[in-house]
Regions:
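Single conserved hydrophobic/aromatic residue that forms the stacking wall/gate
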Residues: 199-209
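Short, glycine-/small-residue-rich phosphate/pyrophosphate-handling segment
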Residues: 126-145
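Short, acidic/small-residue loops that bind anionic groups at enzyme active sites
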Residues: 102-127
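Glycine/threonine-rich flexible loop motifs
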Residues: 94-103
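Active-site rim beta-loop-alpha module in soluble metabolic enzymes
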Residues: 124-132, 150-191
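A cross-family phosphate/adenosyl-ligand binding-site feature
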Residues: 3, 14-82
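Short, glycine-rich nucleotide/cofactor-binding loops
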Residues: 5-12, 99-100
Length: 209
């Protein structure tokens, strides 16, 4: 298959590199990904401004834009080959429940709804998973499973896959579930001094202003 691969963590993130390596064993993979981390941008696009695209090779394009920009640019006017399916990930951090509304990983996947097969967003629930290689290899199997269905059986769908922190030994199979309502996220802590604000986010990473 011809696969368009993107993400929201950036073109050089561990997750996208791991799944690219795994997918390339049996498929043609074209990477169109953001230049830097774009987590939390949902399906936003760069409106009324130019977008810089850097061609690293025939199968790697780096975009100064959002994850959704990458999806639309890759599908509409960048790649000559017909794309069969769009894969977004592997994101390091879960995208479950209400989180899908602002997830850049899921937002990018939405751009592939008109393709032959439904777009697939993939996330690891842990920022440092036990075995990213296992998740990447299992993701390939799930991509092939999704694309084995007839189009009418899964039309107008977006597949959102989340891996708990598991490896080959602890894997017990897959379960298909609807999107649930997630608990209220932790209240952010804001610490002030004379020079900046420190915002302690729900993720393990602190943000400074």
């Amino acid at each position: 298959m011809n696969i368009l691969l993107t993400n929201d963590d950036g073109f050089d993130a561990e997750g996208i590199m791991a799944i690219r390596t795994a997918l390339e064993k049996n498929h043609n993979v074209y990477v169109v990904a953001p230049e830097k981390n774009c987590s939390g941008l949902s399906a936003s696009i760069s409106y009324l401004k130019e977008i810089e695209i850097r061609k690293e090779s025939e199968k790697l394009y780096i975009v100064k834009g959002t994850p959704a920009d990458c999806a639309y640019i890759g599908l509409l006017n960048l790649l000559n080959n017909e794309i069969d399916v769009l894969v977004s990930g592997i994101n390091l951090g879960a995208n479950i429940g209400n989180d899908v509304l602002y997830s850049g990983t899921v937002g990018a996947a939405l751009g592939g709804r008109k393709l032959k097969f439904p777009p697939i967003a993939i996330s690891s629930c842990e920022y440092i998973p036990k075995s990213l290689e296992f998740i990447a290899n299992k993701s390939c199997e799930l991509v092939e499973l999704v694309t084995s269905f007839k189009k009418q059986e899964i039309s107008n769908k977006v597949v959102n896959i989340n891996f708990p922190d598991i490896d080959e030994e602890s894997y017990k199979g897959i379960k298909v579930v609807p999107i649930a309502k997630r608990d209220t996220p932790p209240t952010p802590n804001i610490l002030k001094d004379n020079s900046c604000l420190l915002y302690t986010s729900p993720s393990p990473r602190d943000l400074h202003w």
